[in-house]
Amino acid sequence: MATSISTQRGQVFIGELPQDFLRITPTQQQQQIQLDAQAAQQLQYSGVMGTMGRLSITVVQAKLAKNYGMTRMDPYCRIRLGYAVYETPTAHNGAKNPRWNKVIQCTIPPGVDSFYLEIFDERAFSMDDRIAWTHITIPETLKEGKHVDEWFSLSGRQGDDKEGMINLVMSYTSVPAMMPQQPVVLMPTVYQQGVGYVPIAGPIYNPGMPMAAPPPAVNPQHQTREEDIKFIKDMFPTMDPEVIRSVLEAQGGNRDAAVNSLLQMVEDS
């Protein structure tokens, strides 16, 4: 039991303090708010198996309506998908017919079904000039294992869908995504002590069994086939077969994507 003594600064407690010293008892409404917040967090982070997609976009070339450069135009593409931004190399002096042949691997978060594409003219002494743009919905046929090779209209200063067209080759792969398993809140039983703070209801955890992501199934179409290597070797007779094999494996057996990657390697060399 605490006792009180007098000092020059007034009375002070010494010894054991009472149980309710500097404690604020939460009201029923405050406890309910805390439980609601914990329940909302549990719903947000429910440990379910989600699915994310990996989209392969090959930015092949564009046919633009006008050359906006003073002497030359050096276009490059920028793609915004979700919160991620991807860019192609600059097609130096590409003018109205730039070619990139750039393969971009994008991760599609759940709920995202489109991306935004812009074409800029790279400037040396001023801000890069945006010359064309378009909003592209990801085709549903990609999820059926098909490839899409299409020309998409571009908008710009000439008007909507009047700035030219851009050629894109797209393919899609499903990727399992594991979200963290959160404990389940059963009931508040413990109070966290603190000076001047409302005690926080402590949950009882039911961790459950840890979830393990199943190994991804091997798609026979993604296995490296000798006929694919021979086909690409005929297109690149001077290329080392082992280089072709490694690029093909890196592209998951996608022959078109491997060809685009090798084209980019040849251009960069």
Swiss-Prot record:
Spell out the family assignment given in the record's similarity comment: Belongs to the tollip family.
PROSITE patterns xref list? C2, CUE
Any one Pfam family here would be: C2
Q: What region holds the C2 domain?
A: 35-152
What range(s) does the CUE domain occupy?
224-267
| Subunit-level organization | Interacts with ATG8 family proteins (via AIM motifs), and ubiquitin (via CUE domain). Found in a complex with TOM1; interacts (via N-terminus) with TOM1 (via GAT domain); the interactions leads to TOM1-recruitment to endosomes and inhibition of TOLLIP binding to PtdIns(3)P.
Q: Which InterPro entries match?
A: C2_dom, C2_domain_sf, CUE, TOLIP_CUE, Tollip_C2, UBA-like_sf
* Compartments where found: Cytoplasm; Endosome; Early endosome
Q: Which UniProt keywords apply?
A: Autophagy, Cytoplasm, Endosome, Immunity, Inflammatory response, Innate immunity, Repeat
Q: A Gene Ontology MF term for this entry?
A: ubiquitin binding
Q: Show where the record puts the motif AIM2.
A: 151-154
Explain the purpose of this protein: Component of the signaling pathway of IL-1 and Toll-like receptors. Inhibits cell activation by microbial products. Connects the ubiquitin pathway to autophagy by functioning as a ubiquitin-ATG8 family adapter and thus mediating autophagic clearance of ubiquitin conjugates. The TOLLIP-dependent selective autophagy pathway plays an important role in clearance of cytotoxic polyQ proteins aggregates. In a complex with TOM1, recruits ubiquitin-conjugated proteins onto early endosomes. Binds to phosphatidylinositol 3-phosphate (PtdIns(3)P).
Q: Is Repeat one of the keywords UniProt gives this record? A: yes
Q: Does the keyword Transferase apply?
A: no
UniProt-listed GO biological process terms = autophagy; inflammatory response; innate immune response; phosphorylation
Please name the SMART domains in this protein's record: C2, CUE
Residue numbers of motif AIM1? 133-136
* Annotated GO CC locations: early endosome
Cross-referenced CDD domains: C2_Tollip, CUE_TOLIP
- The protein's predominant localisation is cytoplasm
Q: What is known of its domains?
A: Both ATG8-interaction motifs (AIM1 and AIM2) are required for the association with ATG8 family proteins.
What name does the UniProt record give this protein?
Answer: Toll-interacting protein
